[in-house]
UniProtKB/Swiss-Prot annotation:
It comes from Blochmanniella floridana. Pfam families: LolA. The gene is lolA. GO terms for cellular component: outer membrane-bounded periplasmic space. It is found in: Periplasm. Keywords: Chaperone, Periplasm, Protein transport, Signal, Transport. Residues 1-23 form the signal peptide. Gene3D superfamilies: Lipoprotein localisation LolA/LolB/LppX. The lineage of its organism: Bacteria, Pseudomonadati, Pseudomonadota, Gammaproteobacteria, Enterobacterales. This is Outer-membrane lipoprotein carrier protein. Its main location: periplasm.
Amino acid sequence: MKLFIYFFCLIVFLSSSICVVHSLEPYCVLKNRLNLINNLYVHFVQKINFCNMKEIELIRGELWIKRPNLFYCHVMGSQESFLISDGKTLWFYVPTIKQVTAYCLENIISNNVFLQLLFMSNTNIWQDYTITQKKDWFYFKSSYDDGKHIKQFKIKITDRGIIDQFSIIQENKQHIDYYLSNQCVNLINQDKFCFTLSDDIQLDDQRMKF
């Protein structure tokens, strides 16, 4: 589940935080490009590889994002699932077993270093990363090797706000790539990000278990 949150958080944080340090100029350029996006719909393909680059998992789906904190991800295929943020609760729903897990969005952020990095407007956190730009690619590399930081991540976004790809390299050398297509930035109705709990769905409520 957390793999889908990374992309969402990057857009939310970078689009809302403030550029205050000249040495972070590539970050400011990226922020300005992401500021072109208030609503986002894309098709995505997620590929997960280990260090030998052997593909181990391929996932397809659709993604809706509405700033500042609304998110709807539909994973297609035999393992269909939905990940929905209504701004307060993060719902993870698996229709084949009629079960939904509810998480407090704030708690998810506070218990994950990567999500703290992406949600909190704290320039000291960003100083833990070296940020560089090469054309439409923006690269983030951790200054630490402590297992607490995402080792590297990168995003490709044009000066028109079109996001093509987003990648993460974790400490265990796992490589996660997202390929995006059919991007649309039209207004998304707020109702899209609501989850209705019906009587036939089993609830696993984790909102108070942190």
